[in-house]
A protein has these predicted regions:
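Short, basic/aromatic-enriched C-terminal tail that caps enzymatic domains
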Residues: 166-168, 174-200
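Substrate/ligand-engaging "lid" and interaction regions
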Residues: 157
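Short glycine/proline-enriched coil/turn segments at helix->beta-strand junctions
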Residues: 3-4, 170-172
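Nucleotidyltransferase catalytic core that binds NTPs
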Residues: 1-152, 160, 164, 183, ...
């Protein structure tokens, strides 16, 4: 009913054969944030996605924007290796109150579910401050304060270049947040438009 014609579901052995010795290591956008908090994660992502692109040649591959860093890692890998596939980033789907849809949301207690909306609220606040011309450090502090006031353990709250995930210069930026509620860890982001010379 969803227009799906085929599902490719290889065995673990097919994807990771015995004596599997090759890894795809992406630097650049894989450094920092999730790359620091989950060592080796993006190497695993890049390796299996590269294998998938070789096993199932496709014109386009669709990735959700909620994991913005992952979209940049995959896009950089595709560009660097000259892979003939277009990476298309799909908008994040959200609950009516703004919380990004995630399978992890089901692990939240009712109280933590109420608090979790502070992630999207922090991003909305960042977007508003960005449009007023606020500097980056105060924006990051405001995001962190919004999350902490809701009882979220903040892993990071940052404004960086939307492509490189490095310091913002004059291009588009992205606000990234990650935090913990109980044993559940959530991430979210919001793109910010270019606005000329930027300072911290």
């Amino acid at each position: 009913g969803h227009g799906v014609r085929w599902v490719f579901a290889p065995s673990v052995e097919a994807v990771y054969p015995q004596a599997h010795a090759t890894r795809i290591v992406v630097a650049g956008p894989a450094l920092g944030f999730e790359g620091d908090l989950r060592p080796g994660h993006f190497t695993g992502v890049a390796t299996v996605v590269c294998w998938l692109f070789q096993a199932v040649p496709a014109h386009a591959a669709y990735f959700g924007a909620k994991d913005w860093q992952q979209t940049r890692v995959v896009s950089r890998m595709v560009a660097d290796l000259g892979l003939p596939v277009e990476v298309i980033v799909c908008p994040t789907e959200r609950e009516p109150d703004g919380l990004a849809l995630s399978s992890r949301n089901t692990y939240l207690s009712p109280a933590d579910r109420q608090r979790a909306v502070a992630l999207s609220q922090a991003l909305a606040e960042a977007a508003g401050l960005w449009l007023t011309g606020a500097e980056i450090t105060p924006i990051e502090s405001a995001m962190r304060a919004t999350m902490e006031s809701a009882g979220i353990g903040v892993d990071y709250a940052a404004v960086v270049d939307s492509e490189s995930l490095g310091p913002v210069t004059t291009g588009a930026a992205v606000a990234l947040v990650a935090g913990r509620l109980g044993t559940t860890r959530l991430i979210d982001n919001r793109l910010l438009p270019p606005r000329g010379a930027i300072s911290r």
